[in-house]
């Protein structure tokens, strides 16, 4: 009894206990309405990706390895689009926090136009140099795996313009506080992907299907359906703050807003592209370790992404919450809420990772029955659980910083940690010392550790708000009118 009383007293004396009611309000009124739909949307996307992997895995180990190699390059491009999407989200959230709907609409419209045109150019270049890209990415993979990876890449690059529209449109809606529409659209899109891809791969009734080609074609068709849905939602004004008519996309560009979006998006995109490029390089390390290791590595990343879903959702929510608070000048509130989201993510993810690690073999069996592949997956998932306590400091904190338009610091930290730790340490341990895929993943965890230390230091010192403080005096200046 004395022990329980002492414990209650310890809890009572903490700062958390004194502010527990305000934290409860924050959780239910601000974090939950944003994070839960984002979590459900991301869960739907990842689960549909898992089901897509199941569909391809039934075609054999080579097919799964081919998709994994092609997707490792596709992730570089998607990371770039997602970074510009982040810039749009922050500008929209900040503009609406200041009750400037017109600026939010113009930022959304111009981001969609510019990134769609860029995606078309990018798809053309990648389609032309596809063979050289796969040779670079696949390393010492077999000829059969390279051929399948090239086929999948050439089909999926056709979906880049649609992916850009869907990502940026969804990001703008989230910035406006509407997370349910992106959830509905992206959820439906991914269900369609499974249905269409399943039919195209394996056929229907007497039609035998297209086999492996159907996987890439189904994804491309589904993405274009999603892009049309996003443009339609914006055109009818489902969210009144972001009503954008189709004819408005042909209006002249406003470069002041473009630079505002790109001021966040470009550092974030440099960070994302360099990060995913480094990850692609580590994928090349794994590519020479055999088909079983390639497949096991691919499956382990898929499972780890599922485990990290709540943290990813909280990171996206922290960007929006921070942008909103700073948009109305509530600096102290933004700082308090970011800390709350960070600790919530850290404790939650650690618990999830440690509880799911004992079932790694069961989860791997949903993807494959190959014992060698399952063995690789089990080892990597246990390692992932061991280092999960530092994940949120590595990823949730910089997401919140970007809501304060502090994107450059995250860019430099990511460059340092990715190339100094993930690539170098991964190569030394995985290749030079012969640790294999475990050494490559240890390089990834070293990357997490460096990021965690530097981002946590920036949070506790308050330096992530310096850029915002410098921009505050400009609020009194009269801004030029923004034409739509």
Write out the residue ranges for each language-model feature.
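Short alpha-helical transmembrane segments in multi-pass integral membrane proteins
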Residues: 1-35, 92-159, 207-266, 322-387, ...
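N-terminal transmembrane alpha-helices
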Residues: 22-54, 58-59, 75-87, 119-123, ...
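Transmembrane helical elements of multi-pass membrane transporters/channels
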Residues: 33-52, 155, 222-226, 230, ...
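Transmembrane alpha-helix boundary and packing residues in multipass membrane permease domains
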Residues: 38, 42, 53-54, 71, ...
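Helix-terminus/linker motif at the lipid-water interface of multi-pass membrane proteins
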Residues: 43-65, 134-143, 199-210, 269, ...
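Small-residue hotspots at the loop-to-helix junctions and early N-terminal turns
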Residues: 61-72, 149, 153, 216, ...
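Small-residue-rich hydrophobic transmembrane alpha-helices
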Residues: 64-124, 163-182, 294-360, 391-414
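Short runs within selected transmembrane alpha-helices of multi-pass transporters and secretion channels
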Residues: 85, 155-174, 182-190, 215-231, ...
């Amino acid at each position: 009894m004395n022990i329980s009383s002492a414990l209650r007293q310890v809890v009572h004396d903490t700062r958390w206990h004194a502010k527990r009611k305000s934290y409860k309000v924050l959780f239910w009124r601000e974090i939950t309405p944003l994070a839960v739909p984002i979590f459900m949307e991301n869960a739907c996307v990842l689960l549909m990706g898992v089901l897509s992997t199941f569909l391809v895995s039934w075609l054999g180990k080579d097919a799964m390895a081919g998709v994994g190699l092609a997707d490792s390059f596709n992730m570089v491009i998607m990371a770039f689009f997602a970074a510009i999407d982040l810039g749009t989200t922050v500008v929209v959230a900040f503009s609406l926090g200041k009750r400037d709907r017109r600026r939010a609409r113009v930022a959304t419209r111009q981001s969609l136009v510019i990134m769609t045109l860029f995606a078309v150019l990018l798809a053309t270049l990648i389609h032309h140099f596809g063979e050289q890209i796969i040779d670079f990415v696949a390393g010492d993979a077999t000829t059969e795996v390279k051929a399948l990876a090239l086929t999948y890449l050439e089909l999926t690059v056709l979906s880049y313009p649609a992916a850009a529209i869907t990502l940026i449109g969804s990001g703008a809606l989230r910035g406006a506080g509407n997370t349910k529409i992106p959830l509905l659209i992206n959820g439906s899109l991914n269900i369609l992907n499974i249905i269409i891809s399943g039919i195209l791969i394996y056929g229907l009734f007497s039609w035998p299907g297209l086999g492996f080609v159907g996987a890439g074609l189904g994804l491309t068709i589904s993405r274009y359906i999603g892009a049309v849905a996003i443009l339609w939602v914006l055109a009818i004004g489902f969210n009144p703050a972001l009503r954008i008519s189709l004819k408005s996309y042909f209006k002249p560009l406003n470069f002041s807003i473009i630079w505002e979006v790109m001021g966040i998006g470009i550092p974030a995109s440099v960070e994302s592209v360099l990060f995913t490029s480094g990850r692609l390089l580590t994928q090349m390390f794994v590519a020479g370790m055999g088909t079983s290791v390639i497949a096991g590595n691919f499956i382990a990343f898929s499972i780890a992404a599922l485990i990290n879903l709540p943290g990813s959702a909280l990171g996206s929510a922290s960007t929006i919450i921070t942008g909103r608070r700073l948009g109305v000048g509530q600096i102290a509130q933004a700082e308090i809420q970011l800390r709350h989201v960070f600790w919530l993510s850290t404790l939650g993810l650690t618990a999830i990772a440690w509880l799911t690690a004992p079932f790694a073999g069961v989860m791997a069996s949903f993807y494959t029955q190959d014992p060698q592949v399952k063995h690789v997956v089990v080892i990597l998932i246990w390692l992932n659980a061991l280092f999960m306590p530092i994940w949120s400091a590595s990823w949730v904190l910089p997401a919140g910083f970007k809501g304060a338009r502090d994107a450059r610091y995250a860019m430099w930290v990511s460059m340092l940690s990715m190339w100094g730790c993930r690539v170098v340490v991964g190569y030394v341990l995985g290749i030079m010392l012969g640790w294999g895929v475990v050494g490559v993943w240890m390089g990834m965890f070293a990357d997490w550790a460096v990021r965690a230390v530097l981002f946590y230091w920036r949070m506790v010192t308050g330096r992530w708000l310096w850029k915002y403080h410098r921009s505050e005096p400009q609020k009194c200046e009269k801004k030029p009118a923004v034409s739509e």
